[in-house]
């Protein structure tokens, strides 16, 4: 397996698809990187030369925010929203949907699975 930016890329897939295994790189960015380096996007990952892998690493490190850096920036943005007490920040704190979805019945994805509470048992009559 080829290792780029701490991620093992599958060797039997096309490089265009393999690059999308890196957090922060989608299909369009992968195509953009390969066109910039003039690498055929239909080539398999195992067929890449070492020089090409080094070039891909350099471009990813210099030009893009990926993996841990991107996750850190996203979490800092969410924390900032919470500290300024914006509407979105409060919704994050409560674990509710942010973008105006209804919460009366369907918000299970955001709120998680149902947590049923056991009912109080009545004291036995004398």
UniProtKB/Swiss-Prot annotation:
RNA-binding recorded as keyword: yes
Bias type Basic residues, positions: 107-126
A GO biological-process term: translation
Entries under InterPro entries matching the protein: Rbsml_uS13_C, Ribosomal_uS13, Ribosomal_uS13-like_H2TH, Ribosomal_uS13_bac-type, Ribosomal_uS13_CS
Tagged with keyword Chloroplast: yes
Cystine pairs: none
TM spans (from-to): none
Pfam family, one: Ribosomal_S13
Function: Located at the top of the head of the 30S subunit, it contacts several helices of the 16S rRNA.
Protein's name according to its UniProt entry: Small ribosomal subunit protein uS13c
Record organism: Gracilaria tenuistipitata var. liui
